[in-house]
Each structure stands twice: as structure tokens, then as C-alpha cells.
Amino acid sequence: MAKKSLIYREKKRQKLEKKYHLIRRSLKKEISQIPSLSEKWKIHGKLQSPPRNSAPTRLHRRCFSTGRPRANYRDFGLSGHILREMVQACLLPGATRASW
């Protein structure tokens, strides 16, 4: 189980990313449309003004049950070892173990 503070920090980053998403997208669109380099630098400075934690690259996917940030399966939202345990316990409908 991940520390509560790390899970809370990740949720805070998600809220910030949602809040500043439209601002970042509009500034990036402006940068791509303007041909002059000096104006691009000015807009790039504005792009750096939102908080650092509002950038989408700072987000991690976390396991739904344990909060583990690594080895997550996007389809299930679970980490690898929790996914394996749930499949073995038949708690995930439609998921089967591989056999060949």
C-alpha cells in the first residue's frame, strides 16, 4: 500500500491538471500558429507561468486498490500482482489465465 501522502499528492496534481488544461492547450495552439520567433518566446514564457504540478507529464497512473505507481494495467486500473490475485480469485469477469 502506498503512503497516503503520495496518493493525496497525486490527486492534488490531477485537480491542478484539470484546472489549467484549457489554458495550456490554448497557449500551445497560439505558439503553433504564430510565425515570428520573438512572439513565440513571449507566449512560451506565459506557458511556464502555471504551477509545475499542473503539467500532465507529472501525473502517474496508480493502482486503484493499493495506490502502487508501477506496473499498472490501463484496462483494469490495477497493478500486476493485484490483477493476478483478482484473476485467480475470479473477481474480474472475462479475464482468464493464459494457457498454451
Swiss-Prot record:
Task: Give a single Pfam family match.
Answer: Ribosomal_S14
An example molecular function term from Gene Ontology annotations: rRNA binding
Has UniProt tagged this entry with the keyword Cell membrane?
no
Reported function: Binds 16S rRNA, required for the assembly of 30S particles.
What is this protein called in UniProt? Small ribosomal subunit protein uS14c
**Cell location:** Plastid, Chloroplast
Q: Which gene encodes it?
A: rps14
Q: Name the PROSITE patterns on file.
A: RIBOSOMAL_S14
Gene Ontology CC terms:
chloroplast; small ribosomal subunit
Q: Which NCBIfam families does the UniProt record give? A: PRK08881.1
Q: What is the lineage of its organism?
A: Eukaryota, Viridiplantae, Streptophyta, Embryophyta, Tracheophyta
Please name the GO terms of the biological process aspect recorded for this protein, alphabetically. Answer: translation
